[in-house]
């Protein structure tokens, strides 16, 4: 991964960390499912692709994805210069980084507490 990609991921992660409460679910499986749902739909929106709204969960993730995609488009004009494959690669790397920060690399023991 080149430095430009890392810098862009850092900007996108920083926005999520400062503005998106959905990253703070109390269990790891909730966080994993939510990260997947929201970031997949955000990617589809950024790439002007159809978004599946077939379930209540899909609709919930879509609402957060619309807010995130709108914020990204308004704050990071370089997204408009990227082609769909590059956006998908960027968002895939962002997803991996977010999962690490909020799930696998988190020191929050409540994430894995079976009684919580």
From Swiss-Prot:
Pfam families: AnfG_VnfG. Keywords: ATP-binding, Iron, Iron-sulfur, Metal-binding, Nitrogen fixation, Nucleotide-binding, Oxidoreductase. InterPro entries: Nase_Fe-Fe_dsu, V/Nase_d_su. The keyword Iron-sulfur applies. GO terms for molecular function: ATP binding; iron ion binding; iron-sulfur cluster binding; nitrogenase activity. The key enzymatic reactions in nitrogen fixation are catalyzed by the nitrogenase complex, which has 2 components: the iron protein (component 2) and a component 1 which is either a molybdenum-iron protein, a vanadium-iron, or an iron-iron protein. Hexamer of two alpha, two beta, and two delta chains. The lineage of its organism: Bacteria, Pseudomonadati, Pseudomonadota, Alphaproteobacteria, Rhodospirillales. It catalyses: N2 + 8 reduced [2Fe-2S]-[ferredoxin] + 16 ATP + 16 H2O = H2 + 8 oxidized [2Fe-2S]-[ferredoxin] + 2 NH4(+) + 16 ADP + 16 phosphate + 6 H(+). It comes from Rhodospirillum rubrum. Its cofactor is iron-sulfur cluster. The keyword Iron applies. It comes from the Bacteria. It is an enzyme of class 1 (oxidoreductase). Its EC number is 1.18.6.1. GO terms for biological process: nitrogen fixation. This is Nitrogenase iron-iron protein delta chain. NCBIfam families: anfG_nitrog.
């Amino acid at each position: 991964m080149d430095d430009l990609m890392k810098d862009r991921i850092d900007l996108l992660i920083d926005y999520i960390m400062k503005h998106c409460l959905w990253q703070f679910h109390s269990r790891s499986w909730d966080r994993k499912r939510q990260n997947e749902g929201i970031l997949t739909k955000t990617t589809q929106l950024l790439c002007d692709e159809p978004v599946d709204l077939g379930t209540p969960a899909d609709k919930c993730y879509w609402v957060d994805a619309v807010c995130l995609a709108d914020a990204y488009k308004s704050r990071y004009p370089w997204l408009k210069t990227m082609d769909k494959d590059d956006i998908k690669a960027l968002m895939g790397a962002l997803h991996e980084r977010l999962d690490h920060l909020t799930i696998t690399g988190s020191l929050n023991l409540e994430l894995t507490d079976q009684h919580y």
